[in-house]
Swiss-Prot record:
GO cellular component, one term: nucleoplasm
Record keyword Ligase present: no
Family per record: Belongs to the CWF19 family.
Gene name per UniProt: CWF19L2
Basic residues: bias regions: 76-99
Name listed for the protein in its UniProt record: CWF19-like protein 2
């Protein structure tokens, strides 16, 4: 006993320690937030200083001119493209204008020939021909001005008075015209549909339901006969209250105007309630706590009586309106016990609608009370299905009606509207019945609250929305529709199954069937919800439409096929079915999809597949199924054969390819976003650009240069290696290389070109570095590099250690997709080395050799030393002066 108490006490923890732990968590969270805020502010200050210094906008004047030239060429190309489309129209216009001009000249010549010829004496200094020509021309022009030429109306209009029209106003006019046209088409289509409409309430623009006035009158007639005018008096009370609020008058004065005095109205209401009450022992029966067997028996009997009533009902049966199903769910927060799916008290009340329809005077009395904060009146229900009154409201209900008339509040106003709510019984399939049908229920739903009316109109106008609201706002607490909205977990399903077994053992088959239906609906809902894409924060980002492609290591790109059929659902942890591989003791297939692949498909898969992919597949299968092998009887080969014969889900391969393509695209986009050498990147240093070609540009390093004149040749597009470049890009790189060699040669310097291609998966931008060296050091450079390459990397390598580039360049010496290091000495060839182990090979290998030759401190070639913006600008201006005589990008032939 003592040990059990000690064990039990060991699980307790003092409030002080709990509070201390919470305080530590709060302090740690505050510290993290403070640090993040400080880092953010520091980054913002750095960006602001960078902007003020002009690092984002300043560029060399020559580079700026080159960019403007590119933009002009681009605009000219676009203009030419536009002109090409409008060339035909212009030609036709010219032909018309020429034709009109020719006709005009013919008319003028006819008029001049018909007029009398005037002879003028010639002046000696002028020839008669010239004078005559001038005279005739003058005469023609005078006649044309007076008779023929007449200005058009548009030429005389004052353009300052003309109203200007913007493109937005034109778009708005077009949009309105389109809407008007669409409305006309809809009206024509609607009129054609109305001619064939059989429902009289749909014809002539109806809503499909009888008018509300008719329904109200019919309700009042029926209610007066059956309930002694109780519903009419309640509606009268609501109308008087609304009138008092609108006119800002006293409620008792309005009651006195209509009924003489408050006492008369109270007496009428009491008489009507007595006439409507048919069962005196309803309250006693309701508050009696039944046993479990009584509950089950009452539930079964009530359901059977409901089925009989439903079967014998005639055409006068009236189904309640749908808006009763869409009321607030707050009216069901009172009794949590009755909300459970297996609650038999709820079942009993559902199965006896006649009892739920009765209104006692005490219940009505509680409606006129001003509700307090700690008091929850349970008179609020959906339809006439009332929850049990609390003790406080039951005591108050015993008082007189006089003390019940108090100042109404907003909450009481909303709760009073539940008088007119109709019964919410029935399944979802009964909710679409016509409201013109009548039922044995005593009251019909009449929306008195204007919010209810607007809700009714919305539901009538939009049937799909109504169905959705009916599903999501189901009011029965124990109904399976309400609980099947969320996906049930495994534990919840197990508990539900236990409830089903328990109900079957107790003989409550109705409850068992209900729970089974709920479980089935939950399973179906889970299957449908898996096909809906999950919402995440990515949706807030701008969506892009891209062509999904796969790229192998050699740079080959091919588009991803879209899956022809939808992907089959996994359906839990089911075992995959085996495909028959043998027929009549002969092997007919190895893999599950052998029948679907042709020889061309197999060849394509073999060409597009790489050794890395095969190694991944082999390692995954070996690690997953190695434990299943048992020596001589089931070896590793047998495991691979049986695994290959398992059937995969339909469309699984296409879906995997699509996911890989999406992952590749995202990684490439992220790499290009933070790339230092892409023009579209936000981190691109524009002030370091020296010259821009067609597909290649020349810039300076973003860190301190190894030697004076250290520069970079970089492709404009995001290319990874020289072995993956196109011919025109490689040729332009060689043109920059020749110009740089010539420039440094005139200065008495030698230069070395380096390229390191590593980490193909990370997709770094290709950089071709040019480092100038003194002549005597440049002559010794091949010896240093040859010795360093021979001693680098693994001792035993798969590839040749040293590749000579004197006869062939790097693109013809190293296969595509392999990581490599290359060095070129001026315009002569150099050496290349295929990197065996990328993790051990340093990315600064070439710079380290040059640093050793020039005795440079290691921090310059390891990570680089940052420079200020002013130092970088001076460096760019100096290099631009050197480069200007050798800049081939400004030549006209380029």
């Amino acid at each position: 006993m003592a040990t059990s108490m000690a064990a039990a006490s060991g699980r307790f923890e003092s409030a002080k320690s709990i509070e201390e732990r919470k305080e530590q968590t709060r302090n740690a969270r505050a510290e993290v937030l403070r640090q993040a805020k400080a880092n953010f502010e520091k980054e913002e200050r750095r960006k602001e200083l960078k902007r003020l210094r002009g690092e984002d906008t300043w560029m060399l004047p020559d580079v700026n001119e080159r960019i403007e030239q590119f933009s002009q060429e681009h605009s000219v190309k676009k203009k030419k493209k536009k002109d090409k489309h409008s060339k035909k129209a212009k030609k036709e216009k010219k032909k018309k204008s020429k034709k009109q001009k020719y006709e005009k000249n013919n008319e003028s010549s006819d008029s001049s020939s018909s007029s009398e010829d005037e002879w003028v004496e010639a002046v000696p200094s002028q020839t008669p021909d010239k004078e005559k020509a001038w005279k005739v021309k003058d005469e023609k022009s005078g006649k044309d001005d007076t008779q023929i030429i007449k200005r058009d109306e548009w030429m005389t209009v004052d353009f300052m008075s003309v109203k200007t029209v913007s493109s937005s106003s034109l778009k708005a006019e077009k949009e309105t015209m389109r809407k008007i046209e669409q409305e006309k088409n809809q009206a024509l289509e609607q009129s054609k549909l109305m001619e064939r409409e059989l429902n009289p309430y749909w014809k002539d623009g109806g809503t499909g339901l009888p008018p509300e006035d008719c329904s109200v009158s019919s309700i009042t007639k029926v209610s007066v006969v059956e309930d002694g005018g109780l519903s009419w008096l309640r509606k009268s009370y609501l109308r008087m209250k609304e009138q008092a609020e609108k006119q800002s008058r006293n409620f008792e004065d309005i009651v006195a105007e209509r009924y003489g005095s408050m006492e008369i109205f109270q007496s009428k209401l009491e008489d009507a309630e007595k006439a409507a009450s048919t069962k005196e022992d309803y309250r006693r029966e309701r508050w009696r706590k039944p046993t479990y067997s009584d509950k089950a028996q009452n539930c079964q009997e009530s359901r059977e009586s409901d089925l009989v009533k439903y079967g014998n009902s005639s055409r006068d049966r009236y189904a309640t309106t749908d808006t009763a199903k869409n009321s607030n769910n707050e009216k069901f927060i009172g009794d949590e016990k009755d909300k459970r799916p297996g609650s038999l008290e709820t079942c009993r009340r559902e199965s006896n609608p006649r009892q739920n329809q009765e209104f006692s005077f005490g219940n009505l009395r509680a409606k006129f009370l001003r509700p307090s904060d700690d008091e929850e009146l349970s008179f609020h229900s959906k339809g006439r299905k009332f929850e049990p009154l609390s003790s406080s409201s039951a005591l108050v209900a015993q008082g007189s009606l006089c003390s019940g008339f108090r100042k109404p509040t907003k909450n009481s106003e909303e709760r009073l509207t539940s008088w007119s709510r109709s019964d919410g019984r029935g399944d979802k399939k009964h909710s679409n019945q016509k409201p013109s049908e009548t039922s044995t229920d005593e009251h019909q739903h009449v929306p008195e609250d204007p919010r209810e009316k607007s809700q009714d109109e919305v539901l009538r106008d939009d049937p799909p929305k109504k169905e959705h609201l009916r599903d999501t706002k189901s009011t029965f607490a124990g109904s399976p529709e309400r609980e099947s909205i969320h996906i049930l977990s495994v534990d919840e399903k197990n508990k539900l199954g236990a409830k089903i077994i328990k109900a079957e053992m107790m003989g409550n088959m109705e409850l068992a069937e209900q729970l089974k239906v709920q479980l089935e609906k939950a399973n179906k809902f889970k299957e449908t919800i898996t096909q809906i894409p999950k919402k995440s924060g990515v949706e807030n980002e701008d969506q892009q439409e891209v062509i999904l492609v796969r790229t192998d290591q050699s740079g080959r790109v091919w588009p991803v096929n879209t899956p022809g059929k939808s992907l089959e659902s996994q359906g839990g942890r089911r075992k995959r079915q085996m495909v028959s591989t043998h027929e009549e003791r002969e092997r007919v297939r190895y893999f599950h999809d052998d029948d679907n692949l042709s020889l061309n498909d197999l060849v394509k898969n073999e060409k597009m597949g790489t050794a890395e992919n095969q190694n991944k597949l082999f390692m995954r299968m070996a690690s997953k199924f190695m434990g299943k092998t048992d020596g001589d009887y089931y070896t590793l080969d047998d495991m691979f054969v049986s695994k290959a014969a398992e059937r995969e889900r339909l469309g699984e391969e296409e879906e995997n390819q699509r996911k890989k393509a999406i992952a590749e695209h995202r990684s490439l986009a992220a790499q290009m976003e933070k790339c230092l050498y892409c023009f579209d990147s936000s981190q691109f240093p524009k002030h370091l650009i020296v010259a821009i070609g067609v597909k290649v540009y020349l810039c300076l390093p973003n860190v301190r240069s190894l030697t004076e004149g250290h520069c970079l040749i970089v492709p404009l597009q995001h290319h990874r290696a020289a072995t993956l470049l196109d011919e025109d890009i490689w040729e332009e790189i060689q043109m920059f290389r020749k110009s740089l060699v010539k420039m440094f040669e005139d200065k008495g310097l030698d230069c070395i070109f380096l390229e390191t291609n590593m980490s193909m998966k990370k997709q770094y931008h290709m950089v071709y570095e040019c480092i100038p060296l003194p002549k005597e050091v440049g002559d010794m450079a091949p010896i240093y590099f040859k010795k360093a390459i021979m001693e680098s990397d693994e001792e035993w390598s798969m590839n040749k250690k040293l590749i000579d580039l004197s006869s062939k360049d790097i693109r013809k010496s190293v296969p595509r997709g392999l990581p490599y290091f290359s060095v070129d000495f001026g315009l002569h060839g150099g050496f290349a080395h295929v990197i065996e182990d990328q993790h051990k090979f340093p990315h600064y290998f070439g710079k380290e050799i040059i640093g050793g030759m020039l005795d440079i401190e290691p921090r310059l070639w390891r990570k680089g030393i940052r420079e200020s913006f002013e130092d970088q600008r001076k460096k760019a201006l100096q290099f631009a002066q050197w480069w200007k005589p050798y800049d081939f990008t400004k030549s006209k032939n380029y």
